[in-house]
Amino acid sequence: MTWFIDRRLNGKNKSMVNRQRFLRRYKAQIKQSISEAMNKRSVTDVDSGESVSIPTEDISEPMFHQGRGGLRHRVHPGNDHFVQNDRIERPQGGGGGSGSGQGQASQDGEGQDEFVFQISKDEYLDLLFEDLALPNLKQNQQRQLTEYKTHRAGYTANGVPANISVVRSLQNSLARRTAMTAGKRRELHALEENLAIISNSEPAQLLEEERLRKEIAELRAKIERVPFIDTFDLRYKNYEKRPDPSSQAVMFCLMDVSGSMDQSTKDMAKRFYILLYLFLSRTYKNVEVVYIRHHTQAKEVDEHEFFYSQETGGTIVSSALKLMDEVVKERYNPAQWNIYAAQASDGDNWADDSPLCHEILAKKLLPVVRYYSYIEITRRAHQTLWREYEHLQSTFDNFAMQHIRDQDDIYPVFRELFHKQNATAKD
């Protein structure tokens, strides 16, 4: 029976190469479409695929055609509706729109539909997070305690009996005995053939036959003296410890839920948190999320309560920072976890509490986190909390802050916080 093995890299997806070429060629238009679609999508399906539309004129290619003007002679088919010099009415609905949309009729030229195609989840996320990096990753790794894990590393000639490899030792024994006795066995085989010939010959050659029997006995004795197993044959399983960088991260989501934070502001904060979570998930194998909501008191809650609880009150931001410090000390050792934090607020805070927030971040949190981002979602002027955080931004490289006014600012602000230039500034 004949077997055909398909070793093509693309398998049945024969057009994958053309698809990848298309994505590379029109990357700018696709990223623009994704950026616009990002602000329209539900927060629950941010990691699914996307239908991307590109204006037809953006993907048009140059082509050769006859120039306008000149004298041409053409022959057209006849008809039974029009005669020479008749005026042809314009079709109903016009053709100057941008395709088959719901726009009004136009009398200016002809329009074309936009080119629409579907991209997969992986393609969507690749384009969404392209040119982004985790800031200060290399600097923090240098002071991180590296864990070591034991891995198999072949075989060694020395070791403890518990690690002996029986199969490999017997293989070495067979190879050694074969190499040491191969010549003697060939010589023994030749002597046995000569003995058989002499034994059947006439007249009998008793002296020669006795000599051959004596040599055969000596060779067999030499072969038997080769030991079946020798210390030279023994092989032991070898193990070595290799550094195993931490592949787990924790993301702290801190949000103000005071009376000034309405549901639309919370939704904008949620979109930012989901972008950060997806971004971390593409870098670390295991990402845990800790939700801390606060007004005058801070509380660790689940995701649903974090975004949709109706509990409100005044605003004391330091309560959330204190709770985060307690959780880090209790559950997330900075030597084993990559700690990230994102804080969302409308900027309102008790005036006397803002300096305390500065002190907690500077002395307790920023020295142990990889990156701390603060987004202020408001259309009003900045208050004391923003001004205190500005001092932190000028002092700590792993602290960043941005201002969000409406939904369209979320994705650009996220890219600004995690652009690769920020990550490589000190490399």
From Swiss-Prot:
Region (Disordered): 79-110
Pfam families reported for this sequence: DUF444
Biased composition (Gly residues): 92-102
Taxonomy, superkingdom: Bacteria
InterPro entries given in the database record: UPF0229
Basic and acidic residues composition-biased segments: 79-90
UniProt cross-references to HAMAP family, sorted A to Z: UPF0229
Family in the record: Belongs to the UPF0229 family.
Protein name: UPF0229 protein YeaH
Gene source species: Shigella boydii serotype 18 (strain CDC 3083-94 / BS512)
